[in-house]
């Protein structure tokens, strides 16, 4: 489990706890939440644990060694740290499946390590494909690893495609177009501001942007939902996963979040996957595919819901959506720049250094400044370099333009 203390990680471990006959946790990676990590170690007794930060490894070691009696695991895990440590855990010899729940581009290298080791991947970290699709897809084909989408929208598409013929050379989701697939419709809740008028967004606060009406998620992805960048990034991910060009991947606002996405086939029939907005459903399917595991989870009752509604997204309200389409069509290193610039812009917003409305502005400026250096056939090092450049570029922009786009100036 990559990112065990985050939203995806905790829900994945809940599934493992509920289904002990099907799943055994052998490796955990985490950031700095040692209290929760230690509880996870006690409960799941993994063979290896990796910390992203080397400086807190001694503290973890000391705290684990001090455990006594029933609190002490039967065997303490092998402890590693840093990038090398994350890669060791991601490619751990006894793991069959790696669930990638590390937020952002930080999940790229350990995910690649898992792929190179031939592990199947339950992909909840969309940035891996968005930033490095041209690198990841060839590695999947070389290693034979299977990529199973673990986020709700791409899981929905994947589930709908189970009844369609796959080409023999396709290894599940590796960008090879599925015969008969005409169109993908990604559903979006509309995020925290779906019921706000566009002109009212100038009053948007951090609290407003991080309060999602339907889903329980981390702060970063909740802000991405509010800007609709999350859905724009999912368009790029769907392109790499399912092989359709961008003109055949649509976004539709569906406030109830019951239909998680739809596919249209060549005969004009449309298949949809439905369920309550609960991330455990797509995570479980990615973990158990091609099987279905019986659960006691809440069952969907359409009579209880009453109605399902849909409408087109407002591009003036959600400029990030069009930025994502443009970056995807530009291809090469541009999606990596878009992704990194967005991560930095959202971080700056959460730090109260820019206003919500400035998130798309700084992203667009970074993408525009990258056009002259765009690489169409990037290698891994190219992706890493432009990721670093884009983050620095965004911070530099905000520093230079602080008189215009800081929160303090905005309040004046």
From Swiss-Prot:
Pathway: Isoprenoid biosynthesis; isopentenyl diphosphate biosynthesis via DXP pathway; isopentenyl diphosphate from 1-deoxy-D-xylulose 5-phosphate: step 1/6
Cofactor(s) needed: Mg(2+); Mn(2+)
EC top class, as a word: oxidoreductase
SUPFAM superfamilies assigned: 1-deoxy-D-xylulose-5-phosphate reductoisomerase, C-terminal domain, Glyceraldehyde-3-phosphate dehydrogenase-like, C-terminal domain, NAD(P)-binding Rossmann-fold domains
Annotated NADPH binding sites: 5-8, 31-33, 125, 127, 218
Keyword list, A-Z: Isoprene biosynthesis, Manganese, Metal-binding, NADP, Oxidoreductase
Domain of life: Bacteria
Amino-acid positions noted as binding Mn(2+) in the UniProt annotation, renumbered to this chain: 151, 153, 234
Binding sites annotated in the UniProt record for 1-deoxy-D-xylulose 5-phosphate: 126, 152-153, 189, 212, 225, 230-231, 234
Catalytic activity: 2-C-methyl-D-erythritol 4-phosphate + NADP(+) = 1-deoxy-D-xylulose 5-phosphate + NADPH + H(+)
InterPro entries in alphabetical order: DXP_reductoisomerase, DXP_reductoisomerase_C, DXP_reductoisomerase_N, DXPR_C, DXPR_C_sf, NAD(P)-bd_dom_sf
The keyword Translocase is annotated on this UniProt entry: no
Pfam families reported for this sequence: DXP_redisom_C (PF08436), DXP_reductoisom (PF02670), DXPR_C (PF13288)
A GO MF label: NADPH binding
GO biological process: isopentenyl diphosphate biosynthetic process, methylerythritol 4-phosphate pathway involved in terpenoid biosynthetic process
Enzyme Commission code: 1.1.1.267
Annotated function: Catalyzes the NADPH-dependent rearrangement and reduction of 1-deoxy-D-xylulose-5-phosphate (DXP) to 2-C-methyl-D-erythritol 4-phosphate (MEP).
Entries under HAMAP family matching the protein: DXP_reductoisom
Family named by the database record: Belongs to the DXR family.
Protein's UniProt name: 1-deoxy-D-xylulose 5-phosphate reductoisomerase
Phylogenetic lineage: Bacteria, Bacillati, Cyanobacteriota, Cyanophyceae, Synechococcales
